[in-house]
């Protein structure tokens, strides 16, 4: 009788142990699978919990996102910062888009880089973003909008009123503010307003954006924002500014109410040897390698020139991988 009881106890214990081992294995498989989902670049936001603020997520973006249609070699040296279209940028992980516009005489907004017309309209960008979000509803698109050049003669109204009456009314735009969480932003375009005269709420408002500086400001009442946007400096100063801001971001990784925006772009000197492309070919892999070596839990919003697959390690991929700490096991 005692032998039977002993055998029964051993059987029960072994069953419990095997169940525990399989449960632990399944948990690890699920966790590993979730982390691996970060590397599906068109859907990398999917495994990140809904309650995480966008300000806390490390997000890659593109500087002067609409310059990819420039064909003239001289204009390319001066003004081209992206070689691939919006959908390519989105499919390769970019979720922040630096959109700069001009109001036309038919009261539409077209994209500009300084005085350069980019042969792209704001409608084109919004439609591309809508299609991408329809295909990938787990994602969000952050659209930074700035008035880049004086209105055309004959334009009626203002840049801000035209945008808000003719574009922002689209339900694709998130109309809430505050410290926006990913769950509220999925499937939406989140507006970051770099233009003045706004009468509408929604997105990130009231930006004070001094030129060629690193600065800290407050938006949406209680969200602190540090921006590094030095673009008219020498190469060494630029790289130092990027790394200093990134180090501050890493050291402040648990502050959910502080957003860090870090531009890696440098303005053109007018030749092939000091063009945005030339600078990006060195800066992008250097910053990517710095992230890879430090293995941080947060690097902020990193806005780059020339998102592509040319210069290893790839900056946008290292930025996205910094989010692995946000994925719950």
From Swiss-Prot:
Catalysed reactions listed for this entry: a 1,2-diacyl-sn-glycero-3-phospho-(1D-myo-inositol) = 1D-myo-inositol 1,2-cyclic phosphate + a 1,2-diacyl-sn-glycerol
EC number, UniProt record: 4.6.1.13
Keywords recorded for this protein, A-Z: Lipid degradation, Lipid metabolism, Lyase, Secreted, Signal
Superkingdom per UniProt: Bacteria
Active site: 63, 113
Listed PROSITE patterns: PIPLC_X_DOMAIN
Example of a GO MF term: phosphatidylinositol diacylglycerol-lyase activity
SMART domains: PLCXc
Pfam families, per database record: PI-PLC-X
InterPro entries (UniProt xref): PI-PLC_domain, PLC-like_Pdiesterase_TIM-brl, PLipase_C_PInositol-sp_X_dom
Keyword Transferase: no
Biological role: Cleaves glycosylphosphatidylinositol (GPI) and phosphatidylinositol (PI) anchors but not PI phosphates.
Protein name: 1-phosphatidylinositol phosphodiesterase
Protein species of origin: Bacillus thuringiensis
